[in-house]
């Protein structure tokens, strides 16, 4: 069964400490790559796929995102706990918007548009890392479903990019 995507939530609350010193003046989502602001490129790609309801979770330097409301008609939601909590807090603040939803990282640059209006099932994007990594690693059962998440691991798949959550999956939050 294919799910019609209802909306997208873009996570943009973090301080981007790994982007320092670039992130001292602006959030990483607002950094330009190849002449385009990262988050604006992602918004345009979502629009091109027919996804017009976009919620952006902000925190660090949140006022710098205000222009996106008028320019693109997005909704901003504040993660008041961005300094002490991770993306789980951002999802908590956005829980009322979870439906058939893309959950995206604001700092991804996609050359080719990865978004589609219809998606077959909930998924996470992952990359395999040989050796040790400090990323969020996933474990899988025999059918390929995620059954564990750990911070750090060896010879592991780790989460990257965007995810899709069906309404059924989202309701568990």
Predicted regions and their residues:
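A generic secondary-structure signal marking the coil-to-beta-strand transition
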Residues: 6-7, 29, 100, 136, ...
């Amino acid at each position: 069964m294919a799910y019609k995507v209802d909306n997208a939530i873009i996570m943009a609350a973090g301080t981007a400490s790994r982007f320092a010193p670039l992130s001292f003046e602006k959030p990483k989502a607002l950094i330009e790559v190849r002449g385009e602001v990262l988050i604006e490129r992602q918004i345009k790609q979502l629009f091109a796929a027919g996804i017009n309801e976009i919620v952006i979770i902000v925190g660090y330097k949140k006022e710098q995102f205000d222009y996106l409301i008028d320019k693109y008609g997005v909704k901003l939601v504040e993660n008041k706990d961005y300094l002490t909590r991770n993306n789980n807090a951002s999802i908590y603040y956005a829980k009322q918007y979870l439906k058939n939803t893309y959950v995206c990282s604001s700092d991804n640059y996609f050359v080719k548009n990865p978004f589609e209006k219809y998606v077959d099932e909930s998924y996470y994007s992952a990359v395999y890392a040989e050796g040790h990594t400090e990323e969020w690693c996933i474990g899988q059962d025999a059918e390929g479903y995620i059954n564990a998440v750990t911070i750090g691991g060896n010879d592991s798949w780790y989460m990257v990019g965007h995810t899709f959550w069906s309404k059924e999956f989202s309701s568990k939050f």
